[in-house]
């Protein structure tokens, strides 16, 4: 029942006891090293609860996606620490692998800490059906070469009611933290249209002065993103600083990728913010 959090001096997770004291004995946590392409890929499954897991404690190699939930409902993810991975740590989505689409909703995600070559929390990019009602509290990004908190609807899905640090999963014991993150928040809408019965046609168009030729879906509506509420996040060192390539952590020296926006790919007036700060590390 204890909350897990992270000590930057020790570079280790710990538990918070009822008196607010730090407990560094995390021997109760399940250890998984070299988890492969997916540690868990669940499709069309409801009522999942994963918790108290330490990834890459002794070996940081051969770890890609951690938890992928495709077309799943009523999912709880609590107390997850990933020392490093090459892809998303927690990812809800909805694809066509069942032969039909299925909406996903009711996610309770709490106390997620990690370093990733991709995103710590990612909705999509497989969005063949709607994904709604997701509550995420207490995240700590140690480094991310993409985003800390990402939403990508590419296949017509409606992403709605996503909350970061609302307190829905329980008390907010700490402000969320994002260190060394290329784009702390990334929200995008595109038209890949990876849906059943899609029709496609070639199009030629000019974008930012460049002529592009793309195969685009013609019979699937573009997705929607609605009611995204973000609060209580401290952000610093905005660059792709994951330790995935080796050194933990390499200071910014101009060689790492950077992204100017805090929110990328979305119209800012449509998003609500409370107490969200940025401190640039370069």
Where is each model-derived feature located?
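Extracellular/periplasmic carbohydrate-active domains that bind, remodel
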Residues: 1-282
């Amino acid at each position: 029942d204890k909350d897990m959090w992270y000590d930057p001096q020790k570079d280790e997770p710990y538990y918070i006891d009822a008196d607010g004291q730090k407990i560094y004995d995390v021997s109760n946590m399940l250890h998984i090293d070299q988890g492969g392409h997916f540690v868990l890929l669940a499709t069309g499954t409801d009522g999942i609860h994963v918790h108290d897991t330490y990834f890459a404690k002794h070996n940081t190699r051969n770890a890609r996606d951690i938890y992928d939930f495709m077309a799943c409902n009523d999912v709880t993810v609590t107390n997850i620490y990933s020392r490093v991975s090459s892809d998303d740590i927690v990812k809800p989505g909805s694809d066509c692998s069942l032969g039909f689409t299925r909406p996903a909703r009711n996610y309770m995600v709490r106390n997620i800490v990690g370093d990733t070559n991709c995103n710590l929390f990612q909705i999509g990019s497989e969005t063949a059906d709607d994904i709604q009602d997701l509550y995420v509290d207490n995240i700590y990004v140690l480094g991310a070469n993409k985003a800390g908190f990402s939403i990508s609807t590419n296949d017509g899905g409606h992403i709605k009611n996503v909350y970061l640090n609302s307190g829905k999963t329980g008390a907010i014991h700490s402000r969320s933290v994002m260190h060394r993150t290329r784009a702390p928040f990334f929200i995008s809408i595109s038209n890949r249209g990876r849906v059943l019965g899609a029709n496609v046609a070639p199009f030629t168009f000019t974008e930012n002065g460049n002529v592009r030729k793309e195969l685009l879906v013609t019979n699937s509506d573009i997705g929607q993103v609605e009611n995204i509420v973000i609060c209580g996040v401290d952000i610093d060192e905005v660059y792709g600083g994951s330790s995935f390539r080796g050194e933990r952590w390499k200071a910014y020296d101009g060689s790492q990728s950077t992204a100017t926006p805090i929110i990328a790919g979305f119209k800012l007036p449509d998003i609500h913010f409370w107490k969200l700060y940025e401190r640039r590390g370069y």
